[in-house]
Curated annotation (Swiss-Prot):
Induction: Part of a gvpF1-gvpG1-gvpH1-gvpI1-gvpJ1-gvpK1-gvpL1-gvpM1 operon, maximally expressed in early to mid log phase. Gas vesicles appear earlier when grown in static culture, possibly due to O(2)-limitation. Proteins GvpF to GvpM might be involved in nucleating gas vesicle formation. A minor component of the gas vesicle. Gas vesicles are hollow, gas filled proteinaceous nanostructures found in several microbial planktonic microorganisms. They allow positioning of halobacteria at the optimal depth for growth in the poorly aerated, shallow brine pools of their habitat. NCBIfam families: gas_vesic_GvpG. The gene is gvpG11. The lineage of its organism: Archaea, Methanobacteriati, Methanobacteriota, Stenosarchaea group, Halobacteria. It comes from the Archaea. Its main location: other. It comes from Halobacterium salinarum (strain ATCC 700922 / JCM 11081 / NRC-1) (Halobacterium halobium). Encoded in a 14-gene plasmid locus called p-vac which produces predominantly short, spindle-shaped gas vesicles during all stages of growth. One of its GO terms (cellular component) is gas vesicle. This is Gas vesicle protein G1. Signal peptide: none annotated.
Length: 83
């Protein structure tokens, strides 16, 4: 009975794990957040953003980047090496 359960249920859970990993990778993409930080700085330097807008956006992006790095670190710790 348990062998049959493993045959049918294991692929389903594996698929859910893969989907969760892909969703987290997309939600917490550090490269895109770093690009947003650079864009924010560029807009400030060319005068399209006020100092207040720049500081608020910079602070929000930096906290978002910190969160993304923590999530990615947890994901790396969770990964298994499969042969």
């Amino acid at each position: 009975m348990f062998i049959i359960d493993d045959l049918f249920v294991s692929p389903f859970f594996s698929l859910l794990d893969i989907l969760q990993t892909m969703a987290l990778d997309e939600m917490y993409d550090t490269k895109s957040i770093r690009d947003d930080i650079k864009e924010n700085q560029l807009l400030y330097e060319v005068g399209e953003r006020s100092d207040e807008e720049y500081q608020q956006r910079k602070q929000a992006l930096e906290s978002q980047l910190e969160m993304a790095e923590q999530v990615q670190e947890q994901m790396r710790d969770r990964m298994e090496v499969k042969k």
